[in-house]
Amino acid sequence: MFTESMLFLLLFLLLGLIAKNNSLIIAVAVVILLKLFHVDGKVMEIIQAKGINWGVTIITVAILIPIATGQIGFKDLIDSFKSAAGWIGLGAGIAVSILAKKGVGYMAVDPQVTVSLVFGTILAVVLFRGIAAGPVIAAGIAYMAMQLVAFIK
C-alpha cells in the first residue's frame, strides 16, 4: 500500500491541506482513489494523455459562459481594443496559447523536464497560491529556452 508513488501522493495531499488548496486536494484524492481501487493502467494512461485537453475544454466552457449569458457582447469586444490593457491582454493570450502548444509537445518528448515542471507547479500552488495551469505554460517557456540554447550553440 505504501509504495513510493503513494508516499509521493500523500506528501502532495499534505501540502494541499497545509496550503488549503482545494484543486490540489481534489486532484490528489482522485489519483489516490484510482490507485486504491486498482483502476486499470490503460485508464490512467488515457487520463494522462487526454487530461490536459479535457481541462482546457472545461476552462474554455467557463470562459464562454459570460458570452452565452449576455454578460459579454460585441460592444465589450470592440471596447477592449480601445485601451492598452485590451491590446496587452490580446498579446498575452496569443503568447500563452502558443507557449502552451509548444509546452504540451515538449512534455511529451522530454519526461525529465516534466518531473521538474510538475514539482515546480506543485510548489507554486502550495507556497504562492498559484494555479496548476503552470506545467503546460512552463513547458512552453522551457521549450523556447531550449530552442534558444540550441540556436546559440
From Swiss-Prot:
This is UPF0756 membrane protein lmo1568. It comes from Listeria monocytogenes serovar 1/2a (strain ATCC BAA-679 / EGD-e). The chain crosses the membrane at residues 6-26, 54-74, 80-100, 117-137. Its main location: membrane. Keywords: Cell membrane, Membrane, Transmembrane, Transmembrane helix. GO terms for cellular component: plasma membrane. It is found in: Cell membrane. Belongs to the UPF0756 family. It is a multi-pass membrane protein. InterPro entries: UPF0756_TM. It holds the Pfam family DUF441.
